[in-house]
Amino acid sequence: MAANTKAFQDEEAAFAKIQKILGKKHPAFAKPMGADAGFPDFGFTINLGARNKIDVHIEYKNSHTAQMGSMRDWKFDGSKFYTPDTRSEAKQELISLMNNTGEALNNGKRLLKDFKKYFHQGITEISSGMLSIVKDKFARRPLTENFANNTKNYNIANISSNTLGNKIITHYKTKFKKNIRPGVNKNVLAMMIANEIWIVSTSGSVTNKDLKEIATAFGSSKEFNKLNNLTAKLEVRIQPRGLNAPANNPKPTTIDVMASYRLQGKPVQGTKII
């Protein structure tokens, strides 16, 4: 089973369990729609009184090592990373992280410079189709070997840190503010990992009493803790292909571009709700 299929099935199962706990009194305003369906993954309106309705936006991951995004179509133009797939929410999140990571930008510039120097001076960006600047497919191999023998390594970023995780939190907070529904004056952003939940942010005049009552509605006897730190890992690299083909059966060389980021390490003080 593909990882993204399993993740969506787990998300649907978590939604169904929470929906059962909350009942008809607290209806869903957003349901699981699959990868790249937008923000939030799902959400419920908690009715604490006639004039006290609070939208709880929930971002869901099925494990503390869940992949948050991946792509094989990014490009680097010398100053920034981008992807032609502008509709993919997950890819845009990943691109944002890459462009806000100094190590990734510096190594992107290093590799682009090496491609210009050791492969072809007409190279203007790193991408999966970049070697096509040399029209003769079999002339690409010695040039790719020249690049491979002279560049330091293929890594662009390999970072695991709270700083990276906190960038994800900041990104979620930004999306949260942009996706508050008109006319809803109180909103809560929560993150759910497997069967545990944390509060990430609030908007409007949400009180401590409100937060306690929200936790009660979810079946918890204690208030949800705030998510203060999140550890994540970012991996970005390129990989030349075709260099190991035998001399008597040569193949055109190509460049693979890869990027992924995932959670790493379980946050503390989560509240089990399902």
Language model segments and positions:
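Non-Sec secretion/translocation targeting segments of pathogen effectors
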Residues: 1-2, 274
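Catalytic centers of nucleases
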Residues: 3-78
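Catalytic cores of nucleic-acid endonucleases
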Residues: 5, 53, 59-245, 262
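Selective for proline/serine-rich intrinsically disordered segments
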Residues: 25, 30, 38, 238, ...
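Poly-acidic low-complexity segments
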Residues: 41-42, 175, 256
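Charge-dense, extended regions
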Residues: 240-274
